[in-house]
Regions:
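A conserved beta-strand-loop-helix scaffold within acyl/acetyltransferase catalytic domains
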Residues: 1-22, 69-210, 223
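Aromatic (often tryptophan-rich) hydrophobic motifs at membrane interfaces
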Residues: 2, 14, 38, 42, ...
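Active-site/acyl-donor-binding loops of N-acyltransferases
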Residues: 15-18, 79-101, 228-309
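A gly/proline- and charged-residue-enriched helix-loop-helix capping module
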Residues: 27-74
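Mobile, glycine- and charge-enriched loop segments
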Residues: 31, 188, 195-197, 290-294
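Short catalytic-loop micro-motif centered on adjacent basic/acidic residues
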Residues: 66, 125, 232-236
Length: 309
């Protein structure tokens, strides 16, 4: 969605999801796809432009809009529409700091893992031609399965191919290898204008867990980013924005945290209430499952009944 007043611009990227004939809703793609405004836009432009965008969405048949705000780019985003809800914290590495300072801020357990991997001969390289992409996909899927991740964190092969084709040089695949075998890998996206490297997906081979390859990959990535002029390596947060072990793992590389928030806007209240019939919902309280009509209705099994397997 693009809105302009002739001088400044607002861009709201989203994925369109069909509901019924003529009705649909909007959601951010995987990751942090919040709205963007022109660099020189005054503070009041964003809210006015977003109001105009919401009106355009309503006229186009949109029922609701769910946006994942970028913890860095949308840190000062203010909107009077819907609800902006804090979901958790994310972690980033300040790449403008000298390497000695970055190493000093690295937790001792991570330093130990990185040094052990080095002594064992683990090497990290940038796979510029994505020759190891298939191996990375397998490792990533195995990692998500071990973590009991939901379907949201799994992607088909076309998704990866689209990343490679569409992002080109703005996508990095770094792999950790021991004796020429890929034991871990990570994908990073690059936003050169904003100076942000985004840690996108990563995985490691369970048989080589003692090498802790993800640690040396992130360490190498932040050095690459620093040497190539990037200002931040955004590592993200835990699964589902939780303060879990994944979040703590990322905190081991940097003390810098940022608020991750979502924005929920009901575009068409009448259609929203009609679609949400049978579910506990209110257009005044949007802090629960949103949009409410997409929440699965639990199946109630009468006492003493048996489910067929």
């Amino acid at each position: 969605m693009h809105v302009t007043n002739g001088t400044h611009e607002l861009l709201v990227p989203f994925v369109r999801r069909e509901i019924t004939e003529g009705l649909w809703d909007a959601t951010s793609a995987y990751g942090y796809g919040g709205p963007l405004t022109s660099t020189s836009a005054p503070p009041d432009f964003a809210d006015a432009a977003f109001r105009a965008a919401v009106q355009m969405l309503r006229e186009a048949g949109c029922v609701a809009c769910f946006l994942r705000l970028h913890p860095l780019l949308n840190a000062h985003w203010k909107s009077s529409l819907g609800l902006v809800l804090k979901q958790g914290l994310t972690v980033s590495v300040d790449l403008t700091k000298p390497p000695e300072k970055l190493w000093q801020e690295t937790q001792s357990r991570h330093k130990l893992g990185i040094n052990r991997a080095r002594r064992a001969g683990v090497m990290v390289r940038l796979d510029k031609n994505f020759e190891t992409l298939s191996r990375f996909i397998d490792i990533y899927n195995q990692t998500m399965t071990r973590r009991c991740a939901t379907d949201y964190y799994f992607f088909d092969k076309q998704y990866y191919r689209s990343l490679v084709d569409d992002l080109g040089d703005d996508l990095l695949l770094m792999v950790a290898e021991e004796a020429d075998k890929v034991i871990g890998g990570a994908l990073f996206t690059l936003a050169r204008r904003s100076g942000i490297m985004q840690y996108h997906l990563s995985g490691s081979d369970w048989d080589y867990r003692h090498r802790q390859p993800t640690k040396i990959i992130i360490h190498t990535a932040r050095e690459w980013g620093r040497m190539n002029g990037f200002s931040r390596l955004h590592l993200g947060g835990g699964l589902g924005s939780a303060a879990d072990s994944l979040h703590e793992f990322k905190r081991g590389f940097s003390p810098d945290t940022h608020v991750f928030a979502t924005q929920r806007v009901v575009i068409n209240p009448e259609a929203y209430r009609a679609l949400s019939e049978g579910r506990s919902t209110s257009t005044d309280d949007l802090s629960g499952y949103f949009p409410a009509y997409r929440q699965p209705i639990p199946v109630r099994v009468p006492a003493g009944s048996r489910l067929a397997v």
